[in-house]
């Protein structure tokens, strides 16, 4: 509670909730998710809906509509940041998907490599190594599929 009180002091007294337009976040979220997942979008949403329709909606509205769609950073910047975060967490399938998404939004492989490598700067060498191994797998898969 002390931290919330302090936050209120710093953030100001703006108590007006401006609300949001669900339709805007939903359409922006679907657009962003389709950009990142490409032809795998329908399969992703279908898979998530199969066990939780609510989670599928949350994913689009909150994750891709609000978080990835908000001002401050571009979609490219956000997606490549997610690659770093997922590398730190060692979520292989998600790292791979977001590396692919990064490439789809025109982030170069060199930048993806640097972002993952930078985990070593925060003493996360094993996470960096893990993420780089997924990047290597991604590159090999793309070379072999051509």
Regions found by a protein language model. Give the residues of each.
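Acidic, glycine/proline-rich low-complexity segments that act as flexible tails and inter-domain linkers
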Residues: 1-75, 104, 117-146
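Short acidic alpha-helix initiation/capping motifs at coil-to-helix transition points
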Residues: 57-60, 89-95
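Short Gly/Pro-enriched loop/turn and capping motifs at secondary-structure junctions
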Residues: 87-91, 121-122
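Short, glycine/charged-rich beta-strand-loop motifs at protein surfaces that mediate ligand recognition
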Residues: 71, 84-89, 102
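Short conserved catalytic/interaction loops centered on acidic-Pro-aromatic/His motifs
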Residues: 92-100, 105, 113
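Short, structured motif recognition centered on aromatic/hydrophobic residues
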Residues: 77-86, 95, 115-116
């Amino acid at each position: 509670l002390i931290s919330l009180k302090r936050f209120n002091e710093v953030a100001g007294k703006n108590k007006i909730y401006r609300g949001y337009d669900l339709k805007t976040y939903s359409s922006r979220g679907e657009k962003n998710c389709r950009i990142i997942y490409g032809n795998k979008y329908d399969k992703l949403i279908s898979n998530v809906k199969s066990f939780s329709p609510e989670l599928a909606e949350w994913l689009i509205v909150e994750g891709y509509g609000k978080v990835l769609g908000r001002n401050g950073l571009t979609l490219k910047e956000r997606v490549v940041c997610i690659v770093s975060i997922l590398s730190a967490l060692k979520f292989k399938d998600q790292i791979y998907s977001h590396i692919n998404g990064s490439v789809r939004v025109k982030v170069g492989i060199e930048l993806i490599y640097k972002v993952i490598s930078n985990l070593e700067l925060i003493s996360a060498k094993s996470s960096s190594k893990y993420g780089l191994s997924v990047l290597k797998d991604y590159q090999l898969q793309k070379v072999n599929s051509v």
